[in-house]
């Protein structure tokens, strides 16, 4: 049985969860169709998801179609939960990007497209909501080509449009496809193409062959020899072009009305890759070099933990894993290659949304969940001994909003910290700390909605009431200039007289480069690790009390009597030294700048632009979509608290917006 690991990605409200629910129903995994508005979807199982009608966490579903196992991950469309998308894409082999036939490419569509490009994921495009007023399939196709600089391969043309949309013409099969439900059972029927569509179908078939001939020698040869190009050859070359990411097959439908689902599932099986069709990238722990590993040849276990989820039912964390080679079973001795710890699986599950079926093993290319891990987190590599490889981890964006939190009863503070630990283990974009000045607990996240969801969880899932402060901007800081200095420590530390000198250069880097630590002097590897830990730990809080980013620390000299100093002392004093020298680098404060996409009725565009100008926003573009304008701009995050209320008031409730983090910029005032 073949495997397809796919993700479903889209901007919020493009119909992602509805499409997923239809796929689950049509493949026979569910006997009822979940509905977002009714709050009874299978993939949106969290209470907050059902109440709000949005996807918050990535739900994993396994279903079957035409002798293939399809593992689907339905990912969030809201930018506050972009980490869920990021970690899901890391383990996928293929994806479906859903576009609204009315709204086309939206802000989060661009974000997930870029994320999919980063992980080189082959994709299908599915244009949904073809029955809506303003639906324009060919405009969306044109936008995909122009915006994403890719080649969309149209596989269908619409029969009717807007409220008259009733089916599609399959260009490859040269048939009309009609979709119906009879006694709750889907019924797909085929018919000859009516006369009015014959010429248009022939035109798009020619375009399809022309595109395929750009990379297919076989099709080019058959075309030149005026020979028939068989259905099998066409589908084989579409598959090859999709997997190589040369083309993006485009389909359409109206998921809510069950139109277009079967061809979409067929295309998942026909055109998206199997885990065995692509080698995966890893780092050799023997040579410390990047290598390509063929899953057909490497039979030893290598798996990536891509999600951690707390289950209140069993009061334990469930670890979602993608197996890249070998097999997971409960008898296998495993090793966490990311931290050097030994681990063990106690139970293994096949996951169906929030329900689990216990199984004996997870094989190569498959996705499952395990219990029993004690030292693993998202992004860690699990291997069996002698398979010395490290898989590429998952990178997450920085939190941009923070908030003070305290329990109603002071006696619950320890429990609140335990809850924060649970949540931070499953959500890498959530963190908490304790203010040195006030002793307050501070939580950080990707946006107001992100923190709101977490606070709701604390109340509903953990039965703990808390008080919160107002949301605040999570600033960063960096070095303002290059500084070079030797820090000398001559004092009694841990009962010993310590004389220690460390020479350090701190250089500012460009935004987004991250922090780097280099050594220009020879030093024992154990001591080097201790110094790295000491400096890295200090990055958490700089001169202004904010996390330090985008600096290069160069250690150019160390003078000490190593035998007298323990690792922990090296770690502590290195942190002191860095903190002292960083203070002299003229530290600068950095604020997050957000990208905004505002959708407003045309008559309110002028007022919206004026409001953006008042808060110091920069307008990038204004484009028209029917009765609405789409304004793309950027503004400092601190100016955007409460912007949703301002927009509602300005547009009489008809406007909407999304925003996402763009970059950090020096805060002048």
UniProtKB/Swiss-Prot annotation:
Binding, GTP: 10-17, 74-78, 128-131
InterPro entries hit by this protein: EF-G-like_DII (IPR053905), EFG_II (IPR041095), EFG_III (IPR009022), EFG_III/V (IPR035647), EFG_V (IPR035649), EFG_V-like (IPR000640), G_TR_CS (IPR031157), P-loop_NTPase (IPR027417)
Residues annotated as domain tr-type G: 1-276
A molecular-function term among this protein's GO annotations: translation elongation factor activity
Any one of the GO BP annotations: ribosome disassembly
Subcellular location: Cytoplasm
GO cellular component, one term: cytoplasm
Keywords tagged on the record: Cytoplasm, Elongation factor, GTP-binding, Nucleotide-binding, Protein biosynthesis
Keyword DNA damage: no
Family: Belongs to the TRAFAC class translation factor GTPase superfamily. Classic translation factor GTPase family. EF-G/EF-2 subfamily.
Task of the protein: Catalyzes the GTP-dependent ribosomal translocation step during translation elongation. During this step, the ribosome changes from the pre-translocational (PRE) to the post-translocational (POST) state as the newly formed A-site-bound peptidyl-tRNA and P-site-bound deacylated tRNA move to the P and E sites, respectively. Catalyzes the coordinated movement of the two tRNA molecules, the mRNA and conformational changes in the ribosome.
Name of the protein described by the UniProt record: Elongation factor G 2
Organism: Borreliella afzelii (strain PKo)
